[in-house]
Regions:
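Long, basic/Gly/Ser/Thr-rich N-terminal segments
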Residues: 1-42
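Conserved adenosyl
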Residues: 108
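Nucleotide-activated chemistry modules centered on ATP-dependent adenylation/adenylyltransferase
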Residues: 1-11, 16, 45, 49, ...
Length: 401
C-alpha cells in the first residue's frame, strides 16, 4: 500500500498482494469503491505520525504486507503497525510526537457521546460530518449529516467540525467507516493545533467489555478495537493521542440517563435520518426507544411492528449485540409483554434485580483511563453512578459463558 497526502486530500495505491475486499478490525468484510478521499479544514503541517495514523484508519482493511507513507514516520508508530497488523511501515526517521495536555471529545451527538462529554465539560468537541464524494454519486440523501452538525454547533461548546467524504471509499456493505477509528481521522490531523493528548469516544460497556455490535458476544478485556493495550490503542498512543473511553464502564441505560439529565439534552440525537427529531422508523431508533422507555419507566412508544426486518434481530434467540439492553428493557418497560418485544420474554428471565448491575460502573474501566484524566472520570462515576459490587463485577467478567 502506498499512501500520499496533498493537504487534506488522501490517495492510496494498492500493491499486488493487497485486496479489494478486506476485513476491518472487527472482521467485517469491506469492499473498496475508490482510492481517494478528502478531509476538510485540516492543517498541512501536522506531525507526520498523525498523517500516518489518519491514513491507516482508512487503508488498514485492504493492506496486507507493507505500507509506504509519503513522509517519514517515527519508529514508535512503525513498531505499533508491525506489532498490531504485521505490516512493514516506512520510511522511518521522524521524531515521535509528544502528547498534548488536552482531551478532545469525538462528538457525534448521540446519547453515549453526550454522556462522555458531560464528564468533561471543559473539553472541545471534534465532530465528523459526511459530505458527498466528488466522484461517487450520493444515493443516501436521507443521511442528514447537516442536521447533526447544526445540533453540535448549538451545544455552546467549542466545536470543530471536520468534513470528509472518506466513507465513500466503501462500496460494500454501504458507505461507512473503513475502520471505526476513521471517525477520528480529522481529529488526528488537528491534534497539534488543539494540543490533544487524548481523544474521548462514547463507546460504552457493551462495546468495550461485552463484545457488542459485530464482535464476539463475550467478555472482551482484550478488545482489539477499544482497549488501550489493543492494537488501535497502542497505535494512537504512539502518535501521542491516547484513546479514552469516559463511559466505557457503564451501560447504554446509564449513558441515556446521563445524557437526558445533562445540559446537552436538547441536542441529543442518535438518528441519522430525522430532521426535526429522530425518524422513529429505523432499527437504531427502536433500540434507543426501548432504552429510553426503560430509563423513564414509561410504556414503549414506537410505530415499528414485529414485521419489520430490522426488528427481527431483537426477537430471535440470543446471543446478539445489545442483548444486555434488551434484558434491561424487558425488566422495566411497563406493558412490554404487549409490544413487539413480547416474544423476547421467552428467551430471558429478566428482572430489575438480575439487571441492576447495568446501573453501575465497572471499576476496571476507570483503571484503564490515562492518568491525566482518570481522577475526573472516577469522581464523576462515584458521585453520579456508583461502582459495581464484586458480584456485579463478576456479571461482566462472566458475560457470554
Amino acid at each position: 500500500m502506498r499512501v500520499t497526502w496533498t493537504g487534506g486530500d488522501l490517495s492510496f495505491r494498492l500493491d499486488a498482494e493487497d485486496e479489494i475486499t478486506g476485513r476491518a478490525s472487527d472482521e467485517h468484510p469491506v469492499k473498496l469503491a475508490i482510492n481517494s478521499c478528502t478531509i476538510g479544514g485540516v492543517p498541512a503541517d501536522a506531525h507526520p505520525d498523525l498523517f500516518a495514523v489518519a491514513a491507516w484508519t482508512v487503508v488498514a482493511p485492504w493492506t496486507r504486507r507493507r505500507v509506504l507513507f509519503d513522509r517519514a514516520i517515527s519508529a514508535e508508530v512503525a513498531a505499533a503497525l508491525h506489532d498490531g497488523w504485521g505490516v512493514e511501515a516506512g520510511p522511518v526517521g521522524a521524531e515521535p510526537r509528544r502528547p498534548g495536555p488536552t482531551l478532545g471529545i469525538s462528538y457525534s451527538g448521540g446519547a453515549d457521546s453526550v454522556a462522555a462529554a458531560t464528564i468533561f465539560p471543559e473539553s472541545p468537541f471534534l465532530h465528523f460530518r459526511r459530505v458527498p464524494h466528488r466522484r461517487i454519486p450520493n444515493r443516501w440523501p436521507h443521511y442528514r449529516s447537516d442536521v447533526l452538525a447544526e445540533l453540535a454547533a448549538k451545544t455552546g461548546r467549542e466545536v470543530t467540525t471536520v468534513t470528509s467524504d472518506l466513507e465513500y471509499t466503501l462500496a460494500e456493505p454501504r458507505p461507512g467507516y473503513p475502520e471505526h477509528h476513521a471517525v477520528a481521522a480529522g481529529a488526528l490531523l488537528l491534534a497539534d493545533r488543539l494540543g490533544l493528548g487524548g481523544l474521548g469516544f462514547g463507546y460504552e460497556m457493551g462495546s468495550r467489555w461485552l463484545g457488542g455490535g459485530r464482535y464476539l458476544h463475550r467478555y472482551t478485556p482484550d478488545n482489539p478495537m477499544w482497549s488501550p493495550h489493543g492494537k488501535w490503542g497502542r497505535l494512537f498512543a504512539a502518535a501521542g493521542v491516547h484513546l479514552v473511553l469516559p463511559v466505557g464502564g457503564v451501560s447504554e441505560a446509564t449513558t441515556m440517563r446521563l445524557a437526558l439529565n445533562s445540559d446537552l439534552r436538547e441536542q441529543v440525537r442518535w438518528c441519522l435520518r430525522g430532521t426535526d427529531g429522530p425518524c422513529r422508523d429505523c432499527g437504531k431508533c427502536l433500540y434507543k426507544e426501548l432504552i429510553q422507555a426503560a430509563v423513564e419507566r414509561r410504556p414503549l412508544n414506537t410505530p415499528v411492528t414485529a414485521e419489520r426486518p430490522f426488528a427481527r434481530k431483537w426477537l430471535r434467540k440470543p446471543p446478539y449485540g445489545g442483548q444486555e439492553m434488551i434484558e434491561y428493557g424487558l425488566a422495566r418497560v411497563p406493558g412490554i409483554e404487549n409490544t413487539l418485544f413480547g416474544p423476547a420474554l421467552d428467551f430471558f428471565e429478566a428482572t430489575e434485580e438480575s439487571t441492576s448491575w447495568l446501573d453501575h460502573c465497572y471499576p476496571p474501566a476507570i483503571e484503564e483511563i490515562p492518568e491525566a484524566w482518570r481522577a475526573q472520570v472516577a469522581t464523576f462515576m462515584t458521585e453520579n453512578v456508583g461502582m459495581m459490587t464484586e458480584a456485579e463485577t463478576r456479571r461482566v467478567e462472566n458475560w457470554g459463558n
